[in-house]
Curated annotation (Swiss-Prot):
CDD domains: AGPR_1_C, AGPR_1_N. Its main location: cytoplasm. Catalyzes the NADPH-dependent reduction of N-acetyl-5-glutamyl phosphate to yield N-acetyl-L-glutamate 5-semialdehyde. InterPro entries: AGPR_AS, AGPR_type-1, NAD(P)-bd_dom_sf, NAGSA_dehydrogenase, Semialdehyde_DH_NAD-bd. Belongs to the NAGSA dehydrogenase family. Type 1 subfamily. One of its GO terms (molecular function) is N-acetyl-gamma-glutamyl-phosphate reductase activity. Pathway: Amino-acid biosynthesis; L-arginine biosynthesis; N(2)-acetyl-L-ornithine from L-glutamate: step 3/4. It catalyses: N-acetyl-L-glutamate 5-semialdehyde + phosphate + NADP(+) = N-acetyl-L-glutamyl 5-phosphate + NADPH + H(+). Keywords: Amino-acid biosynthesis, Arginine biosynthesis, Cytoplasm, NADP, Oxidoreductase. This is N-acetyl-gamma-glutamyl-phosphate reductase. It comes from the Bacteria. It is found in: Cytoplasm.
């Protein structure tokens, strides 16, 4: 049994990790660490955890973690995780960072996050944790940068099409929509019920930190040039769920049926990718509470565009679920371990 710690234990991503780890047969959640609420009981903030999490939250002590813990999940804000992860470079700890600290190059991170980047030594030893695509690199790494929620949905939909030269690398447009939990636990005027109810709001147009992340990892799958995308994200009035609908110029003449077959072949060994039949499209309700990514596609001959829809639960496949999937791969366990549950419906 491996012992795990969650650092930053009071955010939505951490709370989802706690829920999912409860059913993992090989991991014991030994420590929940919160610098702002250490000494407090987690079920005082989250009553749904009553009788399950009985230990008080603890302060961060790096050396104690190195001596006692096998797995660390970093659920801290951007700017914090990179400092903690660097402490584990020379240890045997397996570290999964759910923030954006280790996803980008130093220059891109500084530009998009407006913070000092991680060290090059740390970035060089970090693997990007899009499990279905980078599994071999994940197996060899001890530090994993868990993908963002929008990049997870967008990359899983676009990479197979770019790799097979179905779409152009320029002119890709991504329409992203996420539930309110995607904005995090801390409330603001933009996330109040009276603001979000019966309302759809675009945000961070042209400035979203997931733009360079999507471009970086798409560009690794084309030969001639770097990929540029337009991403517009929207906050919608539901608790959880994320949908990316993508529009990409076609590079070759192809039918929808052939596109569907290509997706099925590309992901035939992937436990958590479900490809919709021709004429059927994903919805967020169909993946709620699960680690699935549902993908549907349509070839629009009239406009010479491929339209791709990709749905995930932003807190599971877009965060905690993918983190556990990566830990499973790192340890040689079946990637479905602790994640074999159906979506919540209705």
């Amino acid at each position: 049994m491996k012992k795990a710690a969650i650092i930053g234990g009071t955010g939505y991503g951490a709370i989802e990790l706690i829920r999912l780890l409860d059913s993992h047969p090989y991991i014991e959640l030994a420590k929940i660490i919160s610098q702002s609420q250490h000494g407090e009981l987690l079920d005082e903030t989250y009553p749904h955890l009553a009788t399950y999490v009985t230990q008080p939250m603890q302060e961060l002590h790096i050396q104690q973690l190195i001596e006692e813990i096998d797995i660390v999940f970093l659920a801290t804000p951007a700017g914090v995780a990179k400092e903690i992860a660097a402490s584990f470079l020379d240890s045997s700890i397996q570290c999964i960072d759910l923030s954006g600290d280790l996803r980008l190059s130093s220059s891109d991170y500084e530009m998009w996050y407006q913070k000092k980047p991680a060290s090059e030594a740390l970035l060089e030893k970090t693997a990007y944790g899009l499990t279905e695509v980078f599994q071999e690199k994940i197996k060899q790494a001890n530090i994993i940068s868990n993908p963002g929620c929008f990049p997870t949905a967008a990359l899983l939909g676009l990479i197979p099409m770019l790799e097979n030269n179905i779409i152009e690398s320029k002119g890709i447009m991504i329409d992203g929509k996420t539930g309110i939990s995607g904005a995090g636990k801390n409330s603001s005027a933009k996330t109040h019920f009276s603001t979000t109810n019966e309302n759809v709001t675009p945000y961070k147009i042209g400035t979203h930190q997931h733009i360079p992340e999507i471009e970086k990892y798409l560009s690794q799958h084309v030969e001639e040039s770097s990929v540029r995308v337009t991403l517009t994200t929207h906050l919608i009035p539901m608790t959880r769920g994320l949908m990316c609908t993508m529009y990409a110029p076609l590079q070759q003449d192809i039918d929808t049926a052939d596109v569907i077959d290509l997706y099925k072949h590309y992901y035939e060994q992937s436990s958590f990718i479900r490809i919709r039949k021709q004429g059927e499209y994903p919805s967020t309700k169909d993946v709620t509470g699960s680690n699935y990514c549902d993908i549907g596609a349509y070839v629009d001959k009239r406009t010479n565009q491929l339209i791709i829809s990709s749905a995930i639960d932003n807190l599971v496949k877009g965060a905690a679920g993918q983190a556990i999937q990566n830990i499973n791969v790192m340890n040689g366990w079946d990637e479905k371990t602790g994640l074999s549950f159906l979506p919540v419906y209705p």
